[in-house]
Amino acid sequence: MSNNMAKIAEARKTVEQLKLEVNIDRMKVSQAAAELLAFCETHAKDDPLVTPVPAAENPFRDKRLFCTLL
C-alpha cells in the first residue's frame, strides 16, 4: 500500500509541474538563435573580447618599469 501511495504522490507532483509548465511562452530554436546572433552583432563594438581595448586605455597593460641593479 505504501508503494501505491508513493506512486500517487509522485504522479500528483508531476501533474503540478506540468500545470506550471503549460503557461511558459516558448519559441522555436531557430528564432532564438537568430535573435541571439542579432544581439551579438549589435553589441560586438562594445565587447572588449571582440574589439580589443586600445593599449593607452587598458588598465591591465604592462607597466614597463625598468630597474637597474648595481
Swiss-Prot record:
Detected in the olfactory epithelium, the vomeronasal epithelium and, to a lesser extent, the olfactory bulb. It is found in: Cell membrane. G proteins are composed of 3 units, alpha, beta and gamma. One of its GO terms (biological process) is cellular response to pheromone. This is Guanine nucleotide-binding protein G(I)/G(S)/G(O) subunit gamma-8. It is a lipid-anchor. One of its GO terms (molecular function) is G-protein beta-subunit binding. A lipid is attached at residue 67 (S-geranylgeranyl cysteine). It comes from Rattus norvegicus. Residues 68-70 form a propeptide. Its main location: membrane. Guanine nucleotide-binding proteins (G proteins) are involved as a modulator or transducer in various transmembrane signaling systems. The beta and gamma chains are required for the GTPase activity, for replacement of GDP by GTP, and for G protein-effector interaction. This subunit may have a very specific role in the development and turnover of olfactory and vomeronasal neurons. The keyword Nucleus does not apply.
